[in-house]
Amino acid sequence: MIDINNTLDLIKLKFYNEWLYTAHIYDEGTSPMHETLTKQVIDQYVLPLNIPKNGKVLDLGCGPGYFLNYMREQGYTDLTGVTLSPEDVKMCEANGHTIKKYDMSFLPQQDGYYDESVDFIFLRHSLEHSPYPIFTLMEYNRVLKQGSKMY
């Protein structure tokens, strides 16, 4: 929560916005190795969590959509990727995925990200790209349902 009456919060917000709109957006590109590793992670760590097949699942910093592709193959239906990379957006949308084009640190309520509304968050190799990871994690804690997991 940013307090607009607090000068320090405004300075942080200004810094963050400048960083966000001038920083290079990490574009992973396509990689058979990353695709294979993503499938292994899903098989070993995600599927055993028994996430409901119709549960709301987010892939934050989704890259070219390997997680989204494989989860759809496993029968999951409510999948959303979040990225700022135009190349990744194109690849994911070409595969029929729902993609949100905004900063993964802020999940807007107008898009349905209410308190305790998400069943699972996947953010492999994404959190390190947040300038304020503690705020990002607080946001994920806000939207995750009680007892839900994040990888």
Predicted regions and their residues:
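A short His-aromatic
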Residues: 125-129
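A short glycine-rich, Lys/Arg-flanked "PGG" loop and its adjoining helix->strand segment in the class I
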Residues: 134-149
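Conserved N-terminal segment of class I S-adenosyl-L-methionine
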Residues: 1-116, 120, 124, 137
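Short conserved AdoMet
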Residues: 52, 131, 145
